[in-house]
């Protein structure tokens, strides 16, 4: 679990997302409260439940990006899903309980990676011995014990220095289970995975001789040895506990399952999904192939644009289970300008690096960047507001000719206001054209 303070979390999010301080603060506090809760005694800890969040804001302002960046910071089981993927229980499609099953799978994967990192050094030593045995069968003393001869030591030194990387050896490796693809109706993924596990376990313990280069063999054998050193039962127990106590679920597009005013008829993927989400968010027990999972302390962060529906269109019970509401602001020309320059690996930096691989150097001037920002804002205003994603469209159109001719000759291009006007001026003046091209 992350031990970062709210200020540190916001600072980290600032490296990638411009503005939206309210949303950043809300998720930072929610994340820190997970750590604070774990410092309490067990009796009080069970009483404190997470305060779930609803993020509201137009498309392209950073809701999903906050989730993506948060996933990298948390060091806790994290899963991002779209509400539109699920249907009411009893209908064809995935039911919402599969969210928790996926969270547990994600937790097990995360824990396995952590445990394998811990035993990596021992696994590498064991893999080294197996490779040396293949290169140079060990000499045995009179008592039958393996002796580390001077020749073996020379080979060990060469192996560590990478001098034997390209040499081919024949080794025994675990046989890869035959992939059994089972087609099952939507919503029965749990049964499918159990059947696949049953078939794959039939091959457990079998080995086969394979020819590999020393470099590839070392990686494969290290992974194999690390897997042997990890206690699977203990790992699963830790993973289930981590998912229950520190798990975070981010549900995007929650507005798409809100029932719109004046819209009657059977809303299979709407109100039913909301009702199914209620017990999950409130706290219930979900059956998975790894055991029973309690959702009482899982943090749910939901987000939606709500440009057709309103947060009040969600059923009242669901609104009550999302007590913290954060509104994200629409982007201004100043925000667009900052998005183009401030974040780590900004859009301008990405395009410069891509074209530099072919010897084309492009330089963005301050007035050029301002002009791009103003055009993106103007097109959003006059057509459809898609937020920061508009910058991708504008930049691609702006650099189309340069990108097409890159590599034909080494040249330097300065992107200033005049250049931007020359490339995009006509498009922005003609609303019909910008509607289709930008």
From Swiss-Prot:
GO terms for biological process: protein unfolding; proteolysis involved in protein catabolic process. It is found in: Cytoplasm. SUPFAM superfamilies: P-loop containing nucleoside triphosphate hydrolases. One of its GO terms (cellular component) is HslUV protease complex. InterPro entries: AAA+_ATPase, ATP-dep_Clp_protease_ClpX, ATPase_AAA_core, Clp_ATPase_C, HslU, P-loop_NTPase. ATP binds at residues 18, 60-65, 252, 317, 389. Belongs to the ClpX chaperone family. HslU subfamily. PANTHER family: ATP-DEPENDENT CLP PROTEASE ATP-BINDING SUBUNIT CLPX-LIKE, MITOCHONDRIAL-RELATED, ATP-DEPENDENT PROTEASE ATPASE SUBUNIT HSLU. This is ATP-dependent protease ATPase subunit HslU. It comes from Saccharophagus degradans (strain 2-40 / ATCC 43961 / DSM 17024). The gene is hslU.
């Amino acid at each position: 679990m992350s031990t970062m303070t709210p200020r540190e979390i916001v600072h980290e999010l600032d490296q990638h997302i411009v503005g939206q301080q309210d949303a950043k603060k809300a998720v930072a506090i929610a994340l820190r409260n997970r750590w604070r809760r774990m410092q309490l005694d067990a009796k009080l800890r069970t009483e404190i439940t997470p305060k779930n969040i609803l993020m509201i804001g137009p498309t392209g302002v950073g809701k999903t990006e906050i989730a993506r960046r948060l996933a990298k910071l948390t060091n806790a089981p994290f899963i991002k899903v779209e509400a539109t993927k699920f249907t009411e229980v009893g209908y064809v499609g995935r039911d919402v309980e599969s969210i928790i099953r996926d969270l547990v799978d994600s937790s097990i994967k995360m824990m396995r990676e952590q445990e394998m990192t811990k035993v990596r050094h021992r696994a590498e030593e064991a893999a080294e011995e197996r490779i040396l045995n293949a290169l140079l069968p060990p000499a045995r003393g009179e008592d039958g014990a393996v002796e580390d001869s001077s020749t073996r030591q020379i080979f060990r030194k060469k192996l560590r220095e990478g001098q034997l990387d390209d040499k081919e050896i024949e080794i025994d490796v675990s046989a890869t289970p035959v992939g059994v693809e089972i087609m099952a109706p939507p919503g029965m993924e749990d049964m499918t995975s159990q059947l696949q596990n049953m078939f794959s376990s039939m091959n457990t313990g079998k080995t086969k001789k394979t020819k590999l280069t020393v470099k590839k063999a070392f990686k494969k054998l290290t992974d194999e040895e690390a897997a042997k050193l990890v206690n699977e039962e203990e790992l699963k127990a830790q993973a289930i506990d981590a998912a229950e106590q520190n798990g975070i679920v981010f549900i995007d597009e929650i507005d798409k399952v809100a029932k719109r005013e004046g819209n009657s008829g059977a809303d299979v993927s709407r109100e039913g999904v909301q009702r199914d989400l209620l017990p999950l968010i409130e706290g219930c027990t979900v059956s998975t192939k790894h055991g029973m999972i309690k959702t009482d302390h899982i943090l749910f962060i939901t987000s939606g644009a709500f440009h057709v529906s309103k947060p009040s269109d969600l059923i009242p019970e669901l609104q009550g289970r999302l007590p913290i509401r954060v509104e994200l602001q629409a982007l201004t020309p100043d925000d667009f300008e900052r998005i183009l320059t401030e974040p780590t690996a900004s859009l301008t930096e990405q395009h410069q690096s891509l074209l530099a691989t072919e010897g084309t150097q492009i330089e963005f001037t301050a007035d050029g960047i301002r002009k791009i920002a103003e055009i993106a804002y103007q097109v959003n205003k006059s057509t459809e507001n898609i937020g920061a994603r508009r910058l991708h469209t504008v930049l691609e159109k702006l650099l189309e000719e340069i990108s097409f001719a890159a590599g034909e000759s080494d040249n330097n291009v300065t992107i200033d206001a005049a250049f931007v006007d020359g490339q995009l001026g006509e498009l922005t003046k003609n609303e019909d054209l910008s509607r289709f091209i930008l």
